Amino acid sequence: MDLIEKIDEMLPLYPKCERARETGVLDLNSSNLTVVPPVVFNIMSHAQVKECDISGNLLNNIPPQLALDFQALTKLNISHNFLAILPVEMGNLPALETLDLSSNLFYALPDIVFKLPHLSHLYAQNNFISEFDLSQPIKSDRMNVFDLRYNPLNSSFRIKLVNKYTKFRLVLNEEGVYNEEEQ
């Protein structure tokens, strides 16, 4: 890619990246991105990004560089894309508290969500998740909301999930909220 192509690719994103350098909030939502351009990471290289919103794009993967470069992330919104997997590097986001991966193409919960030590809000609604490994422990002791609405959870798994003792609020379809209080 020559310099002119890089500049053309970056023009609409440059003001957003400059604003993020000042605020710590990178908002690239609804930018018609099919990839997160590497030049974004170059511009943001010395910035401390605490929040990143790349929702409403056309992404089918998240570059591992996001997790490697944005170690201070507390909030990541990757909803409304075409994602089915996440890079393993995302499991190393030590400060991540809120992860929104709703309205994507996930058939299973990515293993990394169980490894995030400070995760308190996980939004995974409107995917294609039918079940996941209930024996895998959630590393975070701060989990507050786990939203699985509008997923085709199979009935036997749903029963196991509802009966599993949790300290967090489990949200499932219109049937209500389960495990809202410690039992």
Regions found by a protein language model. Give the residues of each.
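The feature captures the LRR N-terminal capping module
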Residues: M1-S79, I85-V88, T98, S130-Q183
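Tandem repeat domain/solenoid detector
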Residues: F82-A84, V88, N92-E97, L105, ...
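Extended, charged alpha-helical interaction scaffolds
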Residues: D100-L101, Y107, V113-I129
